[in-house]
A protein has these predicted regions:
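Hydrophobic alpha-helical membrane-insertion segments
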Residues: 24, 71-73, 96
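Di-metal (Zn2+ and/or Mg2+/Mn2+) metal-binding site signature of metallo-dependent hydrolases
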Residues: 54-76
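A generic structural signal for short coil/turn motifs at secondary-structure boundaries
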Residues: 16-17, 69-71, 125-127
Length: 154
């Protein structure tokens, strides 16, 4: 049995958290990086991905994306693909409803660590003029029940 499921071979590894920038191989097993070193034994991998001339780095985090969209014609799966292709592995959506976000995940598969915030926008998601505290509590409770991770006040 191969030690690594995948080796990403010969790329320029950029890892600021560990002060690393070097040409190296990245050994992955069980979905986790288990070793980073020059010249890992490629015969000990189920798959080898040639990354020569490419950067290899931890996934990016985008804390304000609009993958769920607000228009009925917007397909959240397209936003998911765009994020993954750009190297993003974790994203907080701030562009649509929890249902839209979940619908995109169901069609595309997650592929990302993704969560959504509910925006409290006067004249859009909350009344324009000074809503009573009980109304705001109800709106927040509803958003959290529908799957929002948090609330952003605008």
């Amino acid at each position: 049995m191969a030690r690594y499921d995948v080796i990403i071979a010969g790329g320029e590894v950029l890892d600021p958290a560990n002060n690393r920038q070097e040409i190296a191989d990245v050994g992955i097993s069980g979905g986790k990086v288990i070793e980073v070193a020059p010249d890992l034994d490629r015969s000990d991998a189920g798959e080898v991905i040639d990354a020569e001339g490419q950067w290899v780095m931890p996934g990016l985090i985008d804390t304000h994306v609009h993958v769920a969209g607000t228009r009925s014609t917007w397909d959240p799966a397209m936003g998911h693909r765009m994020l993954v292709e750009a190297g993003t592995t974790t994203a907080l959506d701030f562009g649509g409803t929890p249902e839209g976000l979940i619908g995109g995940i169901q069609r595309m598969g997650a592929g990302l660590n993704i969560g959504g915030l509910f925006g409290m926008v006067p004249e859009s998601t909350i009344p324009k003029d000074d809503p009573p505290p009980a109304a705001v509590r109800d709106i927040v409770d509803d958003a959290l029940t529908r799957g929002a991770m948090g609330i952003k006040m605008l």
